[in-house]
Structure formats: C-alpha cells, structure tokens
Amino acid sequence: MDETTVNGGRRASDVVVFAFPRHGHMSPMLQFSKRLVSKGLRVTFLITTSATESLRLNLPPSSSLDLQVISDVPESNDIATLEGYLRSFKATVSKTLADFIDGIGNPPKFIVYDSVMPWVQEVARGRGLDAAPFFTQSSAVNHILNHVYGGSLSIPAPENTAVSLPSMPVLQAEDLPAFPDDPEVVMNFMTSQFSNFQDAKWIFFNTFDQLECKKQSQVVNWMADRWPIKTVGPTIPSAYLDDGRLEDDRAFGLNLLKPEDGKNTRQWQWLDSKDTASVLYISFGSLAILQEEQVKELAYFLKDTNLSFLWVLRDSELQKLPHNFVQETSHRGLVVNWCSQLQVLSHRAVSCFVTHCGWNSTLEALSLGVPMVAIPQWVDQTTNAKFVADVWRVGVRVKKKDERIVTKEELEASIRQVVQGEGRNEFKHNAIKWKKLAKEAVDEGGSSDKNIEEFVKTIA
C-alpha cells in the first residue's frame, strides 16, 4: 500500500515523529509533536495503516500538525505469534519508512522515533538524517531495563530478592517489570530499546525532572550524567496543565472509540450531580484483560459499599460482571465503555483513581492531583505502583494474598485507606504537590519546556 495523507497534501517538515501503533505510545508522542509545533517547527506525525483502522484521529481544524500514513501491512503470513508480528512489522515498516523518506523532495532534518523501534535509527542515518528515541515509560523503568540489557540484572528475580540499583530505592522482586505472557519475546522487545542508546545525540523521556529527581530516586540525574537524556513531560493536553498555552489543545486527538453523544452527555450529568470528592474512578487501560473472577471481586466490593463509582469497562469485559450488577448499582454507580479520562480525573467529584498504573494513566493522575489505588498487571505497571505508594506517596498498592486475584476484602481495605483512612490527607496533599510541579515543568521556562526549546533551537 502506498503512503497516503490524512489532512491534505504532503508538506515540508523539519521533524518527523513516528510512534509504535498502540494507543499508549501514540498519545504521548502526538502531544510532544504539538509542543514542537507550538514552538515553530513543521512536524509530520507518521502513523501506520493498522493505527488508522483501530484508532480515531480527531485533531482540531486549527491544528498545523501534518499527519501522514505508511503501510505496516505484513508481507508475510507469519503474524500469528507476537514474535512473528514484531519480525514482520520491522521488515515491512523499515521498507515503507525508507520509501516515505526517499519520496520527500525536501527531507526532514530529524526523526523522533518510538524507542521500541530502535531500527528506525538505522533507516534514518542511512539517509543522512539524525534520529532520537522517545521513551514512553518512566525513567525508573528505563533504568531497570537498561540494567537488564547490560546483563547486571535478571528478571524475574527470585522471590524475596532485594534489588539495589544506583540512585533508586531498594526494590523487591514484585516491584520489577513483569512479563507473564511470552516473557522472552516481550523482554527482548523491551530491552532492545537500549541497543543503540549510546549512539543517540538526544534521548527524550516522558517524565519531568522533579518527579524522578527527589531524594529517594534521582534516576534522571544519574542517567543524564551518562547519556543525552532530556525530560519533556508530562505529555498531556495543554488545557489540563499550563492553562492552555497551546491553542485548541483540550484532548489528545486520538481515541480507541467514542460513545454516542447521548451517552457521553450522561456521564457528565451524572458526575455533576455528585458531591465533591465522592466518586471512585476505575479504569484498567486499553489493553488489560482481567480474569472473570477478578472482575467479579471488584463488582462485589462495589455492590456492598456505599461509595459512588464510575467504572470504565470495555464491551468485551461486560459479560464478566455478575448478573444484574449494572441495574442493582445504578443508584450510585455508572458503568461505561469509554470516557475522556482527563475530563474525569479533573472533575471535582472524583476522589480516587483505581488504576492498573500504566505510565500514561499514572502521569495523568499525578498531573491532575488525584490519589491512586494501584492494581498493577504487567510490564512497567508493577514498578509504577511501587513509586505511587512508596516514593511519591500518592496512594496505596493493593496487597495480594492470592497471586491470581485481588479479593473483595483486599480491595476494600486499600480503597478505604485512600478515601477514608488516616493517610488520605497526606495522599491528597502529595497529589496536589505533584500537580503543581507537573504544571511548572511544562510552563514557560520550566524544566521540560526548556529541554524542548533547546531541541527546537538545534533544528530551526
């Protein structure tokens, strides 16, 4: 399939930004692209055909970001396994990306690529272009995975193992990144991000200095002393962070799906009717598939409690709910298949975020001052949960007695600790502190703003 355009003819660009075709990777890199545009760069955001089929792009008409599409349709049938898909993706996209660059009369000066696609650097440099990786995980997770890549750390670690890494708090085995499915393939995929780390002139991290440069964890400082790392986050729409410095930047402009307008309106009417800090917001991201037993345990807790809740549950997960749960809890609960998470987290009625601790969700909660109850599932979420509970002190991590599920009783103990327990004031105080520091980082003259400005000056 030939390259196509999303918003008109192909325009000359200073920078091409290319994300791996998954929602959690594209959203922060799309937001980073908007920041570059706001500082005067001409930016092309490159997406693949599979992304256009699974995601809704809805940038405002005023956006000057150039969206272009290249094919990732596999040339082989070897995509039944994750390993086969990744191999086919690399083979196909290496070629279509090269063709895209070759087809530009006035080529860009720079490519910013998703760090999970390190081979993009080879494609770029083969055509005389500079390239830089953009890491969508926290600095702490990058630090851990880099040590795994270098051979000084093995994952999974034996139970009850204490892990000490430079400029990090002591970690237990349960705090390390977890790869329950296809562990060898996923591990290789995640650690390959560091295969050409030493060759980059710029390395972008979606975090902010204050968040990972405090006493318990100075990992940004430690890594920046060794590599050209620049923090550029949080990559969240301007309306929620720096008082709308970016025009019309009220949403990511990228959704997995969108409900009917009537249903969307009902969510906000329902939230508006609730008291301040009275609603639990529950969401486990776009990829997590919970065991039916786990969904039921959470439902049993919500049914028996007196707390109001907004629960985002994909259509494929609804069948796991107990019979008549939605009807029996409708007087104080709402179950939806989609919502604007930023709008929900910024609503005065929300008291707590029950989350899987994906990095985007964690950053959004920190940036909007919302305490968390962490129920991590896999990959980086376990490490993020450790920092939420023990380093940033903005919530708790649910303790499991059974490795398979979190019970109703364990959920109740953790959630009540955050919304009603003695520590609730500390959690909220810390959440507000991080909200303030996140805003300062991206505001004019803040640490992330300065780093972006420095990059722009080398390109313009």
Swiss-Prot record:
Keywords: Transferase. Its EC number is 2.4.1.350, 2.4.1.-. UDP-alpha-D-glucose binds at residues 286, 339, 341, 359-361, 364, 380-381. Highly expressed in young fruits 15 days after anthesis (15-DAA). Coiled coil: none annotated. Pathway: Secondary metabolite biosynthesis; terpenoid biosynthesis. It comes from the Eukaryota. PANTHER family: GLUCOSYL/GLUCURONOSYL TRANSFERASES, UDP-GLYCOSYLTRANSFERASE 74E1-RELATED. UDP-glycosyltransferase involved in the biosynthesis of cucurbitacin and mogroside tetracyclic triterpene natural products (e.g. siamenoside I and mogrosides IV, V and VI). Cucurbitacins have cytotoxic properties and exhibit deterrent taste as a defense barrier against herbivores. Mogrosides are nonsugar highly oxygenated compounds used as high-intensity zero-calorie sweeteners; they also possess pharmacological properties such as regulating immunity, lowering blood sugar and lipid levels, protecting the liver, and acting as antioxidants and antitumor agents. Belongs to the UDP-glycosyltransferase family. This is Mogroside I-E synthase. The lineage of its organism: Eukaryota, Viridiplantae, Streptophyta, Embryophyta, Tracheophyta. The gene is UGT74-345-2.
